[in-house]
């Protein structure tokens, strides 16, 4: 019972997203943060206002966090289609596979 | 973690990696120390005596070589006083003479009086040797974490708790 | 596994990189802004040497030089978006006793002031009324180069100066010199310079005429609080 509950909590806390979602996240992080940096510098330099530059930078970063950290539904639109259980060969138990590529 | 225990080679690799990170950080610190000739080339501001120039938590980069000119009046220096652990960041306001024997007096921009009171008893002036570097570059705020952690020890507990939570909630 | 924790770490990691790069650009932008500070006048208006004690409980008598001055300077080009404050100070400089042999000098600050940028006004150590006035003076602008225009007439010294030997009267070849220290929000601290570097011009005319300290004025100073 407790194990099940913990599993549910883990599911929520983990916030998994699918492979396509991961690709999208990577792109979004790079684009939004880099854009934030460029915009904050240019606006700050042109208006000669360093406070505004700081605010733009922090706002853009906060936005990126909100956009990327929670497992929003649009990151889970392409769930992996696993093979049927018991359908094929059973891999040997002692085999150690690099965690990332295995999952 | 558990897989590391099951496989001693992997555990050893992890240990080596950890050691590598530590020794790299240490070597970089010592390398900068050698380049700047300062035992502590990067310091965090701990007091408000240089406000509004420096706030608590700001990061200062020090340079301790006199390549082109001697350390002179107007420079902001970090100095040690005999018998006191904490280095002080203040501005030189008087300099009498030249070379390693020159007498230097410092004062915090935000303080009413000069530092005579802060020096060791019987000491009226600093000499060049008391100084561990002149401030040449500045980054605001990033050192504040160290102040938070040293002044609010319960934050360390909170951080440990958070790390534990992450470990519990992560599947192996 | 690409979990929320991992994403949090990655975003934070890239954020620090971006913040560092932007900060480096801000610091570098200083070098593209012209600096041409000039001093129009810097001269003494009254020079005295008085006897006093270093502090109330001291029995030691020392000679103190009391120098008042006039200053007209334009440091407005030092104020850019990355300027946090400019520390302006006037020093008196005179040759040391062994000057002929070693070229050694003595130098002491007689007056200083902190000019904050509007972006750093909230940090200034002043009372609430003065703070209100200071903020109002910026008129909502993000930078206020006009603050760099200094016009002081017969400015009272802030620090009486002395010498470790306790002797100062009749010292010759004393000069006043204006200095400044630009404190950035991020990047390199810079001081007044004697030669031009790129867009940054040397401080012009920042030294006063040579003058001689007079003999001791035999009158007890109202307060011997020179420290």
UniProtKB/Swiss-Prot annotation, chain B:
Residues carrying a glycan: 111
Primary localization: endoplasmic reticulum
EC number: 3.4.21.89
Biological processes per GO annotation: protein targeting to ER; signal peptide processing
GO MF annotation terms: peptidase activity; serine-type endopeptidase activity
A GO cellular component entry from the record: signal peptidase complex
Subcellular location: Endoplasmic reticulum membrane
Active-site residues, as the UniProt record annotates them: 49, 90, 115
Lumenal topological intervals: 36-172
Alphabetized PROSITE patterns for the sequence: SPASE_I_1
Regions of this protein lying in the Cytoplasmic compartment: 1-14
Family: Belongs to the peptidase S26B family.
Protein name: Signal peptidase complex catalytic subunit sec11
């Amino acid at each position: 019972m407790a194990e099940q509950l913990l599993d549910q909590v883990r599911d929520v806390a983990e916030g998994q997203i699918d492979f396509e979602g991961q690709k999208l996240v990577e792109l979004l992080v790079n684009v939004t943060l880099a854009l934030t940096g460029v915009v904050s510098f240019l606006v700050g330099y042109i208006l000669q206002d360093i406070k505004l530059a700081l605010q733009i930078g922090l706002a853009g970063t906060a936005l990126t966090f909100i956009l990327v950290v929670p497992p929003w539904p649009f990151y889970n639109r392409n769930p992996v289609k696993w093979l049927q259980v018991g359908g094929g060969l059973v891999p040997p138990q002692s085999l150690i596979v690099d965690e990332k590529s295995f999952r | 973690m558990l897989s590391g225990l099951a496989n001693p080679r992997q555990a050893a690799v992890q240990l080596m990696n950890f050691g590598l990170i530590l020794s790299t950080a240490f070597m970089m610190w010592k390398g900068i120390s050698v380049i700047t000739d300062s035992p502590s080339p990067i310091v965090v501001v701990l007091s408000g005596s240089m406000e509004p120039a420096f706030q608590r938590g700001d990061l200062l980069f020090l340079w301790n070589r006199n390549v082109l000119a001697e350390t002179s009046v107007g420079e902001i220096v970090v100095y040690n006083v005999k018998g006191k652990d904490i280095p002080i960041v203040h501005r030189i306001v008087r300099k009498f003479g030249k070379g390693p024997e020159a007498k230097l007096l410092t004062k915090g921009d935000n303080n009413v009086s000069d530092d005579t009171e802060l020096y060791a008893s019987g000491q009226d002036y600093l000499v060049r040797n008391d100084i561990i570097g002149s401030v040449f570059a500045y980054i605001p705020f990033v050192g504040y974490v160290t102040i938070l952690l040293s002044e609010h020890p319960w934050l360390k507990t909170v951080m440990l708790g958070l790390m534990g939570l992450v470990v519990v909630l992560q599947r192996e | 596994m690409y979990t929320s924790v991992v994403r949090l770490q990655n975003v934070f990691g890239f954020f620090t990189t971006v913040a560092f790069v932007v900060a480096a650009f801000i610091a570098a932008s200083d070098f593209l802004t012209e600096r041409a500070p000039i001093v129009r006048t810097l001269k003494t208006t009254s020079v005295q040497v008085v006897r006093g004690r270093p502090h109330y409980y001291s029995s030691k008598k020392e000679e103190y030089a009391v120098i008042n001055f006039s200053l007209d300077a334009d440091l407005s080009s030092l104020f850019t978006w990355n300027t946090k404050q400019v520390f302006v100070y006037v020093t008196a400089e005179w040759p040391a006793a062994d000057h002929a042999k070693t070229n050694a000098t003595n130098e002491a600050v007689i007056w200083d002031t902190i000019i904050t940028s509007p972006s750093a006004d909230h940090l200034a150590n002043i009372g609430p009324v003065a703070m209100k006035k200071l903020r109002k003076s910026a008129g909502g602008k993000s930078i206020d180069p006009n603050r760099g225009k200094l016009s002081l007439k017969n400015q009272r010294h802030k620090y009486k100066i002395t010498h470790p030997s306790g002797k100062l009267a009749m010292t010759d070849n004393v000069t006043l010199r204006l200095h400044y220290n630009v404190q950035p929000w991020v990047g390199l601290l810079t001081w007044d310079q004697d030669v031009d570097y790129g867009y940054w011009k040397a401080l012009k005319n920042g030294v006063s005429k040579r003058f001689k300290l007079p003999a001791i004025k035999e009158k007890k100073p109202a307060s011997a609080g020179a420290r």
